[in-house]
Amino acid sequence: MAGSKKSNRREEILQALAHMLESAEGASRITTAKLAQQVGVSEAALYRHFPSKARMFEGLIEFIEEALMSRINRILDEEKDTLERIRLVLQLLLAFAERNPGLTRIMSGHALMFENERLRDRINQLFERIETQLRQILRERKLREGKSFPVEEKILAAQLLGQVEGSLNRFVRSDFKYQPTENFEEYWALLSAQIK
């Protein structure tokens, strides 16, 4: 029972941190004092659940990684057409950001500017994994469909992910007014015409 209560409090702390990142407070550095006040506990209570603020951010990064990578793997299991796989992965990344504005501040690096460098490295690694996955999807086209792209897969993958990262940054910069999935079908038509 005590373990379950501790787990619930950890989750409550992470949800409060994500909520703060989504609010106007997320545009500036979030302190443990502000977070403790948001959760309704003392700073000492926060540290009973997490040894540092960096570990709190790591908890959110782990959630982002698990959510995105598990869904990308599901897309790869269920869809075999290369362009449809790419479309679904890009749409997933944009929709996840749109549904989780506070986490988008982490994904864009904005919330990590004044935090431990290890956190920025972890987000960079996540995007490198996603780019590697995109590159692999593009490379498999030759095996699956007997077609190749006019440009090297490495360049295409970087371009596709760069488009997503630009949308995430625009979403954060606009204080979440610009929706990343807005006009996605037109956006995809433009991108797919360039890579066919």
UniProtKB/Swiss-Prot annotation:
One annotated Gene Ontology cellular component of this protein: bacterial nucleoid
Disulfide bonds: none
Coiled coil: 65-142
Pfam families the UniProt entry points to: SlmA-like_C, TetR_N
Keyword Cell inner membrane in annotation: no
Residues of the HTH tetR-type domain: 7-68
Gene3D superfamilies for this protein: Tetracycline Repressor, domain 2
Compartments in which it is found: Cytoplasm, Nucleoid
Lineage: superkingdom: Bacteria
Keywords: Cell cycle, Cell division, Coiled coil, Cytoplasm, DNA-binding
GO biological process, one term: cell division
InterPro entries, per database record: Homeodomain-like_sf (IPR009057), HTH-type_TetR-like_transc_reg (IPR050109), HTH_TetR (IPR001647), NO_SlmA (IPR023769), SlmA-like_C (IPR054580), Tet_transcr_reg_TetR-rel_C_sf (IPR036271)
Binding region for DNA: 31-50
GO molecular function: DNA-binding transcription factor activity; transcription cis-regulatory region binding
Cited PROSITE patterns: HTH_TETR_2
Record's keyword annotation contains DNA repair: no
Family to which the UniProt record says this protein belongs: Belongs to the nucleoid occlusion factor SlmA family.
Binding partners and assembly: Homodimer. Interacts with FtsZ.
Known function: Required for nucleoid occlusion (NO) phenomenon, which prevents Z-ring formation and cell division over the nucleoid. Acts as a DNA-associated cell division inhibitor that binds simultaneously chromosomal DNA and FtsZ, and disrupts the assembly of FtsZ polymers. SlmA-DNA-binding sequences (SBS) are dispersed on non-Ter regions of the chromosome, preventing FtsZ polymerization at these regions.
Entry protein name: Nucleoid occlusion factor SlmA
Gene name, Swiss-Prot/TrEMBL: slmA
